[in-house]
Swiss-Prot record:
The keyword Cell membrane does not apply. The keyword Nucleotidyltransferase does not apply. To E.coli YgiM. Keywords: Membrane, Signal, Transmembrane, Transmembrane helix. Residues 24-87 form the SH3b domain. The chain crosses the membrane at residues 167-189. This is Uncharacterized protein HI_1605. The lineage of its organism: Bacteria, Pseudomonadati, Pseudomonadota, Gammaproteobacteria, Pasteurellales. It is found in: Membrane. Residues 1-23 form the signal peptide.
Length: 203
């Protein structure tokens, strides 16, 4: 009679707890011997077992026990100590692996981008060095040409100065010669012309 009474009470408790919607998700702990019971107490029979780390929906709580519904749509009672509000490593590992893969992919992309930028920077640096070397060579060439032009200008100025001096000397000699010849004619003409006059008079 007591067994029937307990069974009726358990059925009523179950039907009452089913109507309560907690809408709460918890996770079975890593305990390997996690058993489900038909009621909220050790006196109730074991209704089965549940895998560690499985997510379950909380329907009701009574004392040390919690009524849950698993992914197989089974409803049973489990010790509060066998539940956790944080996902187990079984649930977290795939997420962590996915995050690690995502981060690895991002790092790989960043590394690829960095390598491309490094190669581009090295190429530009090398190109700039080559252009700088060309400009330096052109600058040196222009300096050499400028020095050669200055030397030629100095030579031309020296030649021009020498030519000017030579022309001046030639003009000086020519002018002196003309002056000398004129002076000579000026001295000789007075002596030549009177003699002619005398000869004309005698005739």
């Amino acid at each position: 009679m007591k067994k029937i009474y307990k069974a009726l009470i358990s059925s009523l408790l179950l039907s009452t707890s089913i109507n309560v919607a907690y809408a709460e998700t918890q996770y079975v702990t890593e305990n390997l011997s996690t058993f489900l019971r038909r009621g909220a107490g050790e006196q109730f029979k074991i209704a089965g077992s549940i895998q560690a780390g499985e997510a379950v929906n909380v329907l009701d709580r009574q004392g040390k026990y919690t009524l849950i519904r698993d992914n197989k749509n089974r409803e049973a009672w489990i010790l509060n100590s066998d539940l956790s509000s944080t996902p187990s490593s079984k649930e977290e590992n795939p997420k962590l692996k996915a995050q690690v893969q995502e981060l690895t992919l991002k790092l790989s992309r960043l590394d690829g981008d960095w390598q491309q930028r490094t190669v581009e920077m090295q190429r530009r640096t090398k190109q700039a060095e080559q252009q700088s070397a060309v400009l330096l060579e052109q600058n040196s060439q222009l300096k050499r040409e400028l020095e050669m032009t200055k030397n030629k200008n100095r030579d031309l100025e020296a030649i021009l100065d020498a030519g000017k001096r030579e022309i001046a000397i030639q003009w000086f000699i020519y002018g002196g010669s003309v002056l000398g010849v004129g002076l000579l004619f000026g001295l000789l003409i007075p002596y030549v012309l009177p003699k002619r006059r005398r000869r004309d008079g005698w005739a």
